[in-house]
């Protein structure tokens, strides 16, 4: 743990977790399984992050409805984003704005790609459909209305 990280509450960190770059972690948080958290991440509430998760950029994860478990999967870099579910919809990390809303992720696939391209990222297009199919299976609650 380095880089001026601040950790409070009933946080448990184990199994080769790496936390750096001014990350803030508060609350009943359990982090394990080679997790890498960096880049001013702000994680608060009742959260479990496990199994090779990567949380980077200015990620904000607050107040989950329940524990959230990340299996090792394309979810970590879904379309070049890190993607999280929380009470306010979907938050993303990386170089994207923090104020994405659920509305951003609805509509046609073509519209979604154009919106992402608008923010200056083109490399995600490879394996795009495969990752979308994965996400639709993983988040069935009408987040993805292609």
Residue ranges: model-predicted function:
Residues 45-46, 50-146:
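Intrinsic low-complexity/IDR segments
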Residues 1-64:
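A detector of tandem-repeat and repeat-rich interaction/domain scaffolds
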